[in-house]
Amino acid sequence: FFGLFIYGFLLRFLMQAMRAPFRNPAGNAVIALTDWAVKPLRRVIPGAGGYDWASLVAAYVAEIAWIVSMLLIFSSGFAGFSAGAALFVLASAAVQLFKAVLWLAIVVVILQAVLSWVAPDGPLSALLNALTFPFLRPLRRVIPPIGGTLDLTPLILIVVLQLVLMVPVRWLEAAVMALLR
């Protein structure tokens, strides 16, 4: 339940940051899923620099709510709310949000690669291209297509994102867990 909203808020933030088109089924779904939280937050947290900060804050608050609910369910509740516990929740939410962005990027790259073969002119193509282009462009400058048509940059990007998930993100998770000691 929380994950759906977290990914919805993140997708909305990324779509606006990368100027992706919203006039498609996925864009309409993201707006329908997130408007209830983002619109009121925009009154307090306006967009700046081309970024919809309200969407990112909504994702962060949803991540905090998820972590607190899991702590309440799977532990005997908060033994005592301390500054250390608050710092753990805030840091853990930031790391989990970063992890969610990486997983979202992996899924979007896979969808874009599959749809480029199956339905290159489909209604989601422009959206997926807008979301993946900023990540694939630097790789495409260095790695040309094989035989002129086979682009391996999505695969390379997925491997790089997986490596980021395996090394720095795990280190960050361990550092956050150390806050509990």
How should each PLM-predicted stretch be described?
Residues 1-181:
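Selective transmembrane helix interface/packing segments
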